Amino acid sequence: MPIANGDSLGCAMKADIQDYTKALEILEKEYTTRDGLDVDTLLDSDKHGALTYNDFLILPGYIGFPASDVTLDTPVTKRVSLKVPLLSSPMDTVTEHNMAIHMALLGGLGVIHHNCSPEDQAEMVRKVKRYENGFILDPVVLSPKATVGEAKALKAKWGFGGFPVTENGTLRSKLVGMVTSRDIQFHTNLDDPVTAIMSTDLVTAPAGTTLAEANDVLRSSKKGKLPIVDADGNLVSLLSRSDLMKNLHYPLASKLPDSKQLICAAAIGTREEDKHRLKLLVEAGLDIVVLDSSQGNSIYQIEMIKWVKKTFPEIDVIAGNVVTREQAAALIAAGADGLRIGMGSGSACITQEVMAVGRPQAVAVRSVASFAARFGVPCIADGGIQNVGHIVKGLAMGASTVMMGGLLAGTTESPGEYFVSNEGQLVKAYRGMGSIAAMEDKKAGAGSKDSKASNAGTARYFSEKDRVLVAQGVAGSVLDRGSVTKFVPYLVAGVQHSLQDIGVKSLDELHDGVNKGIVRFEMRSASAMAEGNVHGLHSYDKKLYS
């Protein structure tokens, strides 16, 4: 090809050009370091200051596989793993039973907040555990004397129909019939006994039948429910057709391997009264308890971890929040099964501003997660997540999962209230648990004057006995995001494509690549951040997914 600047320059350039087929060989021989920075150099606070997610990028690697091959399986505690590394925060405008159910169905986990009475929180746990089951070991059972009105009330309460009727109205009593949604739907006399409408032509399976065998019987029977009975015809458990359909629609669902129930997590404080709360939650079927505190390195939390592990050894404990190795070490030594990392980085949190205490999230996650990994303790990057990129960066820093509050607060499944903003946009209420609005909420204390002593916000920020409440959070609103059934799959697909760009097929590969210096990073200047965002357009529509 002709050289524009003359033959002499062209000859000189030609003499320096090497055999292109040896590019990889020359790269390996002559370049002793990789492009970019390893994670330790990146996070050297002496050189760069403390960094958070927007301060750096991950460099691309080699793509040799489709994004669909990327798996996101990850532990959330020592004993519990998820298919998707996403959690919803235990905030009263983010996670109640509806969010917890859908996060679990989508492969993640929702942590139910505790800014409510213990009984209400236990009821939410119960709803999660009943939503999708394998063998239902504690089905709602009716007696022959129960009325049609009572059956309808139970359907309205639990959100499902199909109740077995036994002689004594209890489990392990002789099965006499089934009341289905169709039986009660158009029956007008609510005082009639259920025996007047129940179905007696039942298909059953014997006790000892495996779940796979029972599912086969249920498929072929075309019934909605399959009662499991012992040799004497006594009801011992139940299987639901609706769960078969959920299995088809939600293949990544977070379920226990034995019961096939959705995994449920809930938060509590570290006060003495929280022990009673936890007992109710465990009775309702709780799997994981999250000890909720803005500063987890306290004698209260250490003693609570030890008490929970001794009293309920089957329950996994996630402790926190922490941002330093020193904080983490005390909780790990006490027996924590997982750690929550973050202090002041949440979108509705002002702890760093008001208290001058906290740590930028990227360096906090790396410092704690790399230490906790030595003891097999998974870590949650909690706070500061605004987009898919932040999720990936939190995972790259060593977190096993990422917890989101504001990012999910605008979804249909969050308990916040919808309203129209002054600009005419549909928004949802969202507040930090350190906001005055959250700390003055009286639901946890059943409306009593001393409800501050039971409030989740005051407990989280050690403010139960304060005469003057000092806010560490704000109350506001977030734009409507639609349902998590569309938004979370978008986040998952985004993480898969990001890991594909990095050149890793799993979170284990990502962590291993970061630790070995294979996955590299680059600092970002203010100009680089501007360049990496939308620029130079007169107008644009930023639609994130379809």
Swiss-Prot record:
Keyword entries, A-Z: CBS domain, Cytoplasm, GMP biosynthesis, Metal-binding, NAD, Oxidoreductase, Potassium, Purine biosynthesis, Repeat
Subcellular localization: Cytoplasm
EC number: 1.1.1.205
Catalytic activity, as annotated: IMP + NAD(+) + H2O = XMP + NADH + H(+)
GO cellular component, one term: cytoplasm
Domain CBS residues, every copy: 135-197, 198-254
The UniProt record lists the keyword Cytoplasm: yes
Pathway given in the UniProt record: Purine metabolism; XMP biosynthesis via de novo pathway; XMP from IMP: step 1/1
GO molecular function: IMP dehydrogenase activity; metal ion binding; nucleotide binding
Catalytic residue positions: C349 (thioimidate intermediate), R460 (proton acceptor)
Summary of subunit composition and partner proteins: Homotetramer.
Protein name: Inosine-5'-monophosphate dehydrogenase
